[in-house]
Structures are given as C-alpha cells and as structure tokens.
Amino acid sequence: MSAAYDVLPPALGLPPGFDRHGSCGVEQRAAIAHLAAQVGAPAREWPVLVESLLALGRTDIPLARLVEGHVDALRIHDQAGTKPVQDAVYGVWASRSRATGLSGHQDGTAWVLSGTLKFASGAGVIDRGLVPAWLADGDHVLLDLDVSTWAFDETRWRTRAMELSRSHQIDLADHRTEATQVGEPGFYLGRPGFFPGGAGVAAVWAGGAARVADLLESAVPAEHRSAGQTIRFGQVRTDLATAAAVCRDVARSMETGRPADLRTAATLARTGVAGCVRRILTDTRAVAGPAGLAHDEDLTRAVDDLSLYVGQHNADADAEWLGGQS
C-alpha cells in the first residue's frame, strides 16, 4: 500500500492462505468471521465504525460486501433490542429489485413465505438472514431466519464481477419455517438506523477504491509513468481523500445531528462517495490500459467488482431527492 493513500486506514488481515479468486463457501464463511472480529462490536460509534469499514473495503471487495451485511445485521439487532444467534454469520436480504421480495403470514408458530429474493448475498455461505416479510395489509415485519439450507439459483449471475459475493436468486413458494421477529411491524424501514446504513456501504465503496488504487500503484510504478498517467494518479489521490473526508464528516454528523437529518447525511455520503469512486475507476482504466486490465488478475477483478458494487447507487434518484430539499 502506497503512502500516497495513507489518508485511509490500511487493509485488514485475511486468513492465512485465503484464495481471493477461488475460495469455497466454507472458506468464505471463515473469512467473514475473521474480518468481522477485526471490524469490532456492532454498537461502536459511527466515527469508529467508518474507519473499520474503510479498512474492510480496502481488504477485498466481495468479502467486504458480505462482512458489511453481517455487521449491518448485528447493528439492526442492537437497534431492535434483540439478540442475534451466537456465532452465526448473518446477512440482510432486503432487496425489492423489480418489485420482488417475500410475502408472509403466520401459521401457528411457523411463518409461511412466498416470493423471490434477488441479490441474496452470501447464499450458500451465511447461516442466517434478516429478511423483511410483507404482510397482506401492506406492512412488513423483519424476520431472523435460518437460511443455511435454502436452495438458490446461481445460473442468473452472468458476470465474473462480484461473483464471490454469491448474490444469487432465491425462490420460495409456501415455504414453512421457524423465525424470530426482530422489532415491531414496520421496524426495518422505519427505524432511525435505516438511512445511516447507506453511509456504511459508502465507506466500503471508498475502501474498495483504495484497494483499486493500491493495485494500480503496484502495476504502474512511478518511474514508468507518462505525464498523462501521473496526472491521473493525482486525480485518484484527490478523489480518495475526498471520499474519505465525506465518510468521516457524515460519520460525525450521525452522532451529533438530529434524527430528521440522517437521511440527508446518508444520501450525501452515498452520492459524494459514489461520484469519487466512479472517477477513480475511469482514471484506473485509462492508466492501466488494455494490457493492464487483461493481464493483471487482481487489478481487473477489483475494477470489475467495484464497478458493479457501486452501480447499485442510483445517482439520478439521489440527486433529485437532494435537489428537492430546502
């Protein structure tokens, strides 16, 4: 890691011998637990948590996606005043992409669930998921579920980008399962911690950009750079510093700001960081060129992973919302 990028914390330590590009589910689960222990307790204050998430993103982008989901699940339990299953690896499966999601109703002590979950990250890897179930009256409840044996469809993931996040599709039809309800109906979307969670994701994006920058620095040493490449490196350094500053500023506001301002702060973080990350990716592609992207597996994987990951940010929707606030 270059001293030029020490505005961000260093990467965390991976388990010895961990294969970034060919790990199995068991190895990934162990790596999630290993990294989560370094991130620390879910109740940490935001400025401390953001530093850990920046370091996490700098470590490995697909793994960071999974660890961030685990940490988010533990924070949700903490906000609800409920307890997670001890030593379980968690995820949050709450995507409603293209009007998907699970409907559910109680039948005795069991829940009956139907529907489609897209982007179920960690499918086949994690032990438990926090999943919103939508009720007949339009409200929702958040359920803590054992998802370790749920079947999933991996054929729909057609890209190598983020493939090791194992974000697969799950289809359920009248699936009976035991579950623990987390919070009251409406808790998941209505809790004060919902929007701040997006700032945590932004910190992982910023850390992921630092990983890309580290790899680019190794691929194109200073003594071999053209003037144009040197300019691009300067732009990368500036955008990394900006992204880190945005994350840290928003983290401070999470601790001191009014609850009503949390959505604005989190949206500013996501929008500001995503813009920096996209520019870093553009500069990285320009510096590396076809040869660098074709021949350096670590670099090209990191670029592709981060491009897809930050692609979940809807820049136009967030800009429209921010522009409409007085």
Residue spans of the language-model regions?
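Extended amphipathic alpha-helical segments enriched in small hydrophobics
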Residues: 203-257
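Flexible, small-/acidic-enriched active-site or ligand-binding loops
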Residues: 149-176, 185-190
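Glycine-rich flavin
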Residues: 19-126
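A glycine-rich, basic-preceded beta-loop-alpha segment at the flavin cofactor/substrate interface
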Residues: 173-198, 212-226, 248-251
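C-terminal helix-coil-helix/basic helical segment that borders enzyme active sites and/or dimer interfaces
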Residues: 13-23, 242-274, 282-296
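Generic structural signal for well-ordered, non-transmembrane alpha-helical segments
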Residues: 207, 234-241, 267, 271-278, ...
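Glycine-rich phosphate/cofactor-binding loops in nucleotide/flavin-utilizing enzymes
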Residues: 290-326
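DPxDG-like acidic metal-binding loop motif
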Residues: 116-155
